[in-house]
C-alpha cells in the first residue's frame, strides 16, 4: 500500500494531507479527513521528520483533527496566503469577494501540511472511477502485446509536474514551445503524477516498454492545447495520450471546454487513428 492506493476502496488511507489555516476572523480552519478514522497509525510533518501525538498535538472529533492549545502542528497564517489586490491582471482571477484582496498561490504550502495515515470502517458513497479500458481497444492491445508503447501527457502545470516534491520532468515552455527541464527535490520527494502513472503502467505491463513524453506547459489553457496539439503531440507517435487541461480554463463555459477537448482528440486521431 502506498501513494497510489485507491482512496475509494478498502479501509486504509496513506498519508492524507491536511492543512490548518487562519481564516478572516482569526479562527483556525482545516483538519477535515476523508473518512472518520478507526485507528490513526501516524500523524507526521510533511517530511516525516516530526511525529505528532494524539492528546498532545491534536484530538479527534469524528472525521476531524482539532489542534490542542499547545500543539506543535503548524498553522498557515492568513497574511501568508491572502494579499492586497493591487490591480495586477494576473491575480484578478483569484480576487476575493471583498475586491481588496486575492489568494496567493503559495508554492511551498506543503511546509504547513501534515500527513495522516489511518484505517476506517466508512463505506465510500461518492463518485468512484470505473475501468474504461474497453474504450481504448487499440491502446490496450498494444500494452498487452508488448514492445514500445508511447505514452504522451498533454496539459498544464499540474501535468508538467510543477510543485511535485520529486519532480524530474521534461516539459514545454508555453510561449516558445521548446522543451525545458522541471526539477524539484525536497521531502517527501514524490514524483510528478505523470511519472507515477508511467511507472504503474510499466509495473502492470512488464512486457511493454513504456516511453513517456511530457508535452505539458505551465500556465496553458485548453485553447492553447487546441492550437498546439498538432505540433507538440502528433510527432510523438502516441499510442495513448492523457489530457490534463482545466485548471487555467476554469472560467470557460462547459460547452466550450468540452468542444476544445474533443478538438484536441480529433487532431491527434487524424494522424494517429489507433491512439
What residues fall within each predicted segment?
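N-terminal secretory targeting modules
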Residues: 1-154, 159-186, 203-208, 236, ...
Amino acid at each position: 500500500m502506498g501513494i497510489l492506493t485507491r482512496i475509494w476502496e478498502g479501509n486504509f488511507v496513506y498519508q492524507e494531507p491536511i492543512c490548518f489555516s487562519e481564516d478572516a476572523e482569526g479562527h483556525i480552519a482545516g483538519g477535515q479527513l476523508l473518512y472518520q478514522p478507526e485507528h490513526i497509525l501516524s500523524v507526521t510533518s510533511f517530511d516525516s521528520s516530526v511525529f505528532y501525538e494524539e492528546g498532545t498535538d491534536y484530538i479527534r472529533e469524528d472525521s476531524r483533527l482539532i489542534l490542542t492549545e499547545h500543539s506543535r502542528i503548524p498553522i498557515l497564517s492568513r497574511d501568508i496566503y491572502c494579499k492586497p489586490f493591487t490591480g495586477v491582471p494576473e491575480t484578478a482571477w483569484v480576487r476575493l469577494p471583498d475586491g481588496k484582496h486575492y489568494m496567493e498561490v503559495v508554492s511551498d504550502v506543503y511546509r504547513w501540511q501534515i500527513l495522516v495515515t489511518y484505517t476506517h470502517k466508512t463505506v465510500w458513497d461518492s463518485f468512484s472511477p470505473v475501468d474504461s479500458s474497453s474504450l481504448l481497444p487499440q491502446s490496450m492491445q498494444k500494452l498487452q502485446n508488448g514492445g514500445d508503447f508511447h505514452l504522451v501527457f498533454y496539459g498544464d502545470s499540474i501535468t508538467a509536474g510543477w510543485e511535485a516534491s520529486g519532480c524530474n520532468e521534461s516539459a514545454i515552455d508555453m510561449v516558445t514551445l521548446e522543451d525545458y527541464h522541471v526539477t524539484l527535490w525536497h521531502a517527501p520527494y514524490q514524483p510528478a503524477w505523470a511519472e507515477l502513472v508511467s511507472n504503474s503502467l510499466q509495473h502492470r505491463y512488464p512486457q511493454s516498454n513504456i516511453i513517456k513524453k511530457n508535452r505539458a506547459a505551465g500556465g496553458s489553457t485548453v485553447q492553447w492545447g487546441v492550437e498546439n496539439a498538432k505540433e507538440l503531440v502528433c510527432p510523438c507517435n502516441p499510442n495513448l495520450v492523457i489530457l490534463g487541461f482545466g485548471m487555467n480554463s476554469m472560467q470557460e463555459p462547459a460547452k466550450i471546454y468540452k468542444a476544445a477537448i474533443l478538438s484536441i482528440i480529433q487532431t491527434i486521431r487524424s494522424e494517429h487513428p489507433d491512439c
